[in-house]
């Protein structure tokens, strides 16, 4: 089955976990139609205009923690910042290997042509166009079919400026109503919080119909993931796992950031002590660093806090990008398309636990108090997949690496069934490497039917599902066929069937 490749734009600031997320993201470029790789600013990173202009927004980190460092000309932005260029150049070095394992990887020059600088000068400034905002504007207005997914790994000012320039051009024209409807149908925003307040102050008031997907329940890919990791996830966050599966794997692995690696995104950054090894929290504080997360072992997981914005886009068969509530390796939607607002700027709690809490961590905590069904733990599968793709990047021969199994549910993937009915479903699995493949049918409780369904033989390719007698017409049941091979690392793929209950 041919996998749809969602159109996606990444906007990112030079936070070190954005760097890490970008490495993983490009390893999934085979599954995606990447339309933009855009430098963005945020409250945590902005370049200044190079003209001596000073900037200040009350309540930001430069005036918390007892600091009084701004107004200032720039904040935590390296001169000649090029982390996106660096990762794409590393991708170019390994592209010949990657395309051996999946021919859909885009050529490096295609990715390089998508790089732009957005509204990077000042935190939250949407007063003028930038190359990045111009690219986003053109993509929003084009006539290509399907949704356009726009991530915000940093602030949303570049996205806001693109929308504002559309508003300024068309607001008083006869085309305005049609353009607003088109954009509402087309654009899906995928934020890592509102890191410069431009969603709250401009996008939401002026474009309330744009879908705004925020996720909960998914794997915690953020800073401090190891602090509360489940026992089954903890091994994938250790220094030994990171070294073997990430750091020692070629040019992309070499750019990946871990604790105590000797690197710093911006020289002299008092917030970034992650590259220093051999110091205690108290020693780092005496050295002038703002220690907002406890020191971890050298080489351990540092963070990929923006993964939740794109991990549902991957071609693993869950089709989680089709609807926010479908759920996948990035989590499931918090609520409605215009769900809760979450701003990283609102918390004045500077404790390690509070400061390390990403949107994904917050979402996990929110769900513990809710009535929703438990969410599957996808972290091991996601880490295995990441490891396998990094292995591809350094492996020129197809037979020297593992590849994901193929899984297919025969017939339509959306069917009708009546309450009390027994339906037979047939799956087929295979493996390109000749590995053994284990099968598991399971109910993904993201449908509107709240109860459990009975699956007769969950570990066979063919099985029967009994629709419960209390199912009501119009309710949905999501059934997953999961296939995992026994290669190294083991890789998992899925297919999702949606059963719609007939009206009686």
Spans of model-derived segments:
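Exposed beta-strand face motif in extracellular beta-rich ectodomains
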Residues: 473-479
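Short, solvent-exposed loop/turn segments at the edges of extracellular beta-sandwich modules
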Residues: 484-490
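Surface-exposed, flexible coil segments in extracellular/virion-facing regions
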Residues: 443-466
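N-terminal acidic, glycine/proline-rich low-complexity segments
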Residues: 1-451, 474
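Extracellular interdomain linker/stem segments of modular secreted and single-pass surface proteins
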Residues: 500-504
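Short, surface-exposed loop/turn segments at beta-strand-coil junctions that are enriched for proline
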Residues: 466-473, 486
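Extracellular and select intracellular beta-sandwich modules with Ser/Thr-enriched
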Residues: 490-497
